[in-house]
Amino acid sequence: MLPRLVATDLDGTLLRGDGTLDDRSRRAIATAEAAGAVVVFCTARPARWLKPLAEATGHHGLAICANGAVLWDLHSESVVAATPLEPAIARELVALLGAEVPGGAWAVERTGGFGHEPEYIPRWPVPDGTTIDVVDALVEQPAVKLMLRHNRLSADALLSVAREVGGHLAEFSHSNSADGLLEISAAGVSKATALARLCDERGIDGQDVIAFGDMPNDLPMLTWAGYAVAVANAHPDVIAAADEVTASNEEAGVARVLERLFTG
């Protein structure tokens, strides 16, 4: 039986290293949708980064953003649902992690904008109206994602420390092994929980879902889905958890699997 829903991560999975989508992958997505499958982008990205991709693919359904904290309508460009990290929890996490791994810099992602400490160096363009302030001020409002960047620790190292000292407070992940960036969401929030909620609303069983990913933030989704596919360039933990390893993101790995399934 063909999958009823295709859930795919974007950066490092569906998209090439330069952030673009190749024609083969674009056609494969269209083929899956034409066959009746629901395609859902599941990403750590904020919603504001998705418009060009939606235009390039012609995909105007729903997207799961901010590692599951936001369900976004690509057609109306609006928030369907959001599960933010509350200020009291964010303050506690800042204190705990600041004591364990001093020297980092903080940033927050909200449904309506972005903010960061002066010491935080964004790797990507920030939106107009970005708030630059001390972390105590940044966490006064709920945030869909809290981020800690550290120049001397790897993302894996940050993840290990965070889970040890704050695992009872929030969800921790990262989406880029080459960047010392820890991503923090409210407790119980992940790509998997958002995807499960979406599937439940549509009457789709998890066993009828195929999921693609490359990084630790994809692991909950991959272990929840009926069939999990890692791209060849994936983190070792992701490869170990996958049912199948396809070609890399530079070699249209996602498209190869979709072609096999939906075109025979």
Stretches found by the model and what they are:
Residues 9:
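Active-site residues of response regulator receiver
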Residues 23-123:
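Active-site phosphate-binding/coordination module
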Residues 12, 32, 67, 146, ...:
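Residue-level signal for inorganic ion chemistry
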Residues 1-5, 21-22, 185-264:
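Mg2+-dependent phosphoryl-transfer enzymes with acidic/Ser/Thr/Gly-rich catalytic loops
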Residues 57-59, 66-67, 168, 224-225, ...:
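Short, structured coil segments at secondary-structure junctions
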Residues 25, 50-54, 158, 162, ...:
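Hydrophobic packing residues within well-ordered alpha-helices of enzyme cores
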Residues 100-212, 216-224:
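Conserved acidic, metal-coordinating active-site core of Asp-based
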Residues 36-40, 59-61, 145, 207-209, ...:
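Short active-site oxyanion
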